[in-house]
Design a protein with these regions (language model features):
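ATP-binding N-terminal substructure of ATP-dependent carboxylate-amine bond-forming enzymes
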Residues: 1-104, 108, 120-134, 307, ...
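Active-site nucleotide/adenylate-binding loops and adjacent lid/helix of ATP-dependent enzymes
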Residues: 1-11, 54, 95-189
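Hydrophobic beta-strand scaffold residues
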Residues: 39, 84-85, 113, 144, ...
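A short glycine-rich, hydrophobically flanked beta-strand micro-motif that places a catalytic Asp/Glu
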Residues: 40-45, 184, 192, 256-270
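Short, flexible, mixed-charge acidic loops at enzyme active sites
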Residues: 73-80, 217-224, 280
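ATP-dependent carboxylate activation and anion-phosphoryl transfer catalytic cores
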Residues: 110, 237-327
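Phosphate-binding site of ATP-dependent enzymes
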Residues: 158-246, 267, 272-274
Length: 327
């Protein structure tokens, strides 16, 4: 058995991405058990906090996706309980989860981002949808990508190639949040680059190239086996391979992330990477991207997860340690 002690994987929750989170949690828990770690999977429901306070684990691996999970809320609670946990701080999580804020920060250090505009639902309703959407098309051009300003798993996302489809795409997007981010569509190769840091600084894992059968890497394409073809490492030339790794590590640093992250990019025909978003709780399901990168790097998911938990415990000790014994 591991000397780590009992750990908890947090999964589930109440967001639209609950099912994905549960699948991620089961996958990581299985991997940890495979390397001798005692692990419980806990759902983030109303009984979570009393349970954590009463039976304190040595550390927590949060795998909650979407609101409350990736927006820093639950991580803030873990800090209040003085429980060591894997991943970004509450503040950094909020920054990465808010796509417009993350875009602005990475653009400020010279990373390429698609042209975009944030449109609140209230503005969409009150100022007239037709006029606003016409102005967006005139400014950015077609095709457009419509996505919730906060959220993941491509829920509420759409590629709009015909302006007549834009109103419906906006309505669908607003079902997942108050603000929509409308971006110019970048033609190229879609890749995801995972970054891990087990104590020696952030390192990019091999990039995953994503080729969905239906043309868009939507929720179904992400989590249904056989719906998407993946190439690991991505079929990029050496210069582009180096460039996407550099962008992912720089984004990880600029956004203040730690331990693990995943950056989604498009590499255009000239080999230039365009930043789309960064994720503080990358999916860990059987079709998710980070586990594929881990295998391609010659690593073991259980060993990596265990090392990240050890790092969280050491970090906690450096700042005063947990309140009370770990059970």
């Amino acid at each position: 058995m591991s000397d780590l002690g009992r750990v908890v994987v947090l999964a589930g929750g109440l967001s639209h991405e609950r099912d994905v989170s549960l699948r991620s949690g089961r996958r990581v828990a299985e991997a940890l058990r495979g390397v001798g770690v005692e692990v419980d999977v806990l759902d983030a429901d109303s009984g979570l906090l009393p349970g954590l306070a009463l039976d304190r684990p040595a550390a927590v691996f949060p795998l909650l996706h979407g609101a409350q999970g990736e927006d820093g809320a639950v991580r803030g609670v873990l800090e209040l309980l003085r429980l060591p946990y894997v991943g970004a701080t509450p503040a950094a999580s909020r920054t990465a989860f808010d796509k417009p804020v993350a875009r602005a920060l990475v653009a400020a250090v010279g990373l390429a981002v698609p042209e975009g505009v944030v449109l609140p639902h209230s503005t969409f309703r009150e100022l007239g949808a037709a006029t606003l959407l016409d102005a967006i098309v005139a400014r950015i051009g077609l095709p457009l990508v419509v996505k919730p300003a906060r959220g993941g798993s491509a829920l509420g996302c759409a590629v709009v190639r015909d302006p007549v489809d834009l109103p419906a795409a906006m309505v669908s997007c607003f079902a997942y949040g108050e603000d929509a981010l409308v971006e110019g569509y970048v033609t190229g190769t879609e890749v995801a680059v995972s970054v891990v840091d087990t104590g020696s600084g952030p390192v990019a894992l091999p990039a995953v190239e994503i080729v969905p059968d239906g043309g868009m890497y939507d929720y179904e394409a992400r989590y249904t086996a056989g719906e998407t073809e993946f190439f690991v490492p991505a079929r990029l030339d050496p210069a582009a391979t180096s460039a996407v790794a550099d962008v992912a590590v720089r984004a990880h640093r600029v956004l203040g992330l730690r331990d693990v992250s995943r950056t989604d990019l498009i590499v255009d025909e000239a080999g230039r990477p365009w930043f789309l978003e960064a994720n503080v709780a990358p999916g860990m399901t059987e079709t998710s991207l980070l586990p594929q990168s881990v295998v391609a790097a010659g690593l073991d998911l259980g060993v990596l997860a265990r090392d990240l938990l050890h790092l969280a415990v050491a970090r906690s000790a450096d700042v005063g340690g947990p309140a009370g014994p770990a059970g």
